[in-house]
Each structure stands twice: as structure tokens, then as C-alpha cells.
Amino acid sequence: MPAIQPPLYLTFLLLTLLYLIITLYVWTILTINHNTAVRYAALYQRSFSRWGFDQSL
């Protein structure tokens, strides 16, 4: 039943749009979290590095 199947370019276009939306959403979340982490890292940098070294050993 080829009539029910959507055209190949339409499927490709939808997948591309979905990929772009997900990428933009993830990039926005990561950017906000990164900026927040950088903002607080200046206050807790020594605690974070000390905890990181303790956990790695």
C-alpha cells in the first residue's frame, strides 16, 4: 500500500526537524546548567576539586 506511506522526503524532513528541535533543547538545557555551574564554581572551586581528588583516588 504505497499510497498510505508518506513520501520519503517528507519523512526525512520530519526527522531532520525533530533532530534540530531535540538538539536545540538539549543545547539550551546544557548551556543554562553550565552557566549556573560556572557561577557557583567560583565559590566552591576548592571544595569541588578536593572532593574530586578524594573520589578519584
Curated annotation (Swiss-Prot):
Residue intervals on the Virion surface side: 1-8
Ranges per topology, Intravirion: 30-57
GO biological process, one term: symbiont-mediated suppression of host NF-kappaB cascade
Protein name per UniProt: Small hydrophobic protein
Main location: virion
Source organism superkingdom: Viruses
UniProt record similarity statement: Belongs to the rubulavirus small hydrophobic protein family.
Membrane topology field: Single-pass membrane protein
GO cellular component: host cell plasma membrane; membrane; virion membrane
Function, in words: Plays a role in the inhibition of the host NF-kappa-B pathway. This inhibition occurs at the receptor level, by preventing the signaling of TNFR1 as well as IL-1R and TLR3.
Assembly, per entry: Interacts with host TNFRSF1A, RIPK1 and IRAK1; these interactions interfere with host NF-kappa-B activation at the level of receptor complexes. Interacts with host protein UBQLN4.
Keyword annotations from UniProtKB, A to Z: Host cell membrane, Host membrane, Host-virus interaction, Inhibition of host NF-kappa-B by virus, Membrane, Transmembrane, Transmembrane helix, Virion
Cell location: Virion membrane; Host cell membrane
Entries under InterPro entries matching the protein: SH (IPR001477)
Gene from which this protein is expressed: SH
Keyword DNA-binding: no
